[in-house]
Every structure is written in structure tokens, then in C-alpha cells.
Amino acid sequence: MPPFVAEGVVIVDNASEFDIAQMKTRLAEAGDKFRAAAGASYQTEWRSALEIPTDTLIGEARCADLIVIEKSSRSIDFYRVADIGAAILGAGRPFLVVPGSVKSLTADHVVVGWKDTREARRAIQDALPFLHKAKRVTVIDICENDRKEAARHGVDDVVLYLARHRIKAEGRVETQLLGSGADQIIGFAEEEGADLLVTGAYGHSRLNEWIFGGMTRDLLTSSPICCLMSH
């Protein structure tokens, strides 16, 4: 049984009526802050629930085109904060993961981290609204040296696909270096002045836990720029 936490949004069997009332008050206060921040310029709706955050987020995703969520840099207590990775893999919607240090997103230059996978194909499709508005789009495949010819063919096809959507993109194929692939693509994006990275999110469920691919895990924990990820 999960412990009761004063700031959490989960009801436990031993929570008193007073505890539950406190949580409802905190949720109401959070709703007030949300509405104040949104202002009257946008049509918004506040929804809340006294449930496990990840489960609630996955459920509410049914009526969303895109989920925007802040990347947490602290140790995660999933009774307080949504498990971003599990939500991405379970919601069936694209996620825009925003580092806490990012205050705005122009998406003038978007880097697409390409692999010829279902997840990457879906990510490109989900990112089309951003790609249409971008001033520059780069599709990059970082691969082993003996895969560069096949990678170039795949990247060229993606560039052609985007051109059919009236999106001008440039293709790049880079040799994978020693170390983290996530660090390499982040470094490329930063050097090129990109502020949005589009990638597939890779993982699978085992024994009721989500097991992530190394690239996905590293991007979720260390990327200093916004990531649009789809599973």
C-alpha cells in the first residue's frame, strides 16, 4: 500500500477525511494557478483527480493531440509525479518533454533523430505541425560506419516524404562515436542551434514495468532541449 503524502494526488485506504480534504484543497489551488497563468487569451480546461498521476495522465490523453510535460530532474515519487516514460509508452499520443530551464519554444530549427522504425515514423507524422512552421528542418541518422549507405537511403526518403508535405528538410548521416548516442545527437542539435528534437520513444513492458531503450532513457534524463517523442 502506498504511503500517504500530503502533496500527492493519490487516495490510500488509511487516508482520513481531513487528509483527503487537504488534497482537494491543494488541487483547487493548483487549478486557480493554472487558470491565472493561462489567462483569457486561450480556451483552456482544468481537470484533476485523486488518483495515481501516471494513470490519470494516460487516461486524459484520449482527448489530446499533444501532451506537454516538464522533465523532472529530481528523484521520482510516482505517487506525486507522473512517470514520463511510462506515460509516453502507454498513452498513444506524442509528448513534448520540456526541461525546467526552458521558458519558451520557437522551434525555428527542428532536428529529427531518424531510425527506420515504427516509432520514428510515427514521431515524424506527429511532428508535422511543428515541421511546417520551422524555418529549418534537419533529419539525421547516427549509425555505425558499415550502415551509412543504407542510412543515407532512408534519410533521403524521409526528406522526400517531407517535401511532399511542403516541408524543406536537409539530410545528414553521421558515424556513431563512442559514448552515448543521446549525447551525440544532443550535441549536434545544440551546435546547429536547434531547440526541438523529434525522436521515437523505445521501450517495452516486462513484469508490469517499462524497460526503456538507452537512447530514450538518456534523452528523458539529460536533454537540455525540448524533445517531441512518440511511441
Feature map (PLM): residue ranges:
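Short, well-ordered secondary-structure micro-motifs
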Residues: I58, Y79, D108, A123, ...
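Short, small-residue-enriched loops and turns at beta-alpha junctions
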Residues: S75-I76, N145-A150, Q176-G179, S205
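A short acidic, glycine-rich active-site loop
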Residues: D13-A28
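Small/aliphatic-rich secondary-structure junction motif
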Residues: M1-N14, G90-R93, T106-E174
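Intrinsically disordered or low-complexity boundary/linker segments at protein termini
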Residues: E45, I58-D141, T221-H231
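Structural beta-alpha unit
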Residues: M1, R35-I67, R164-L197, G203-L207, ...
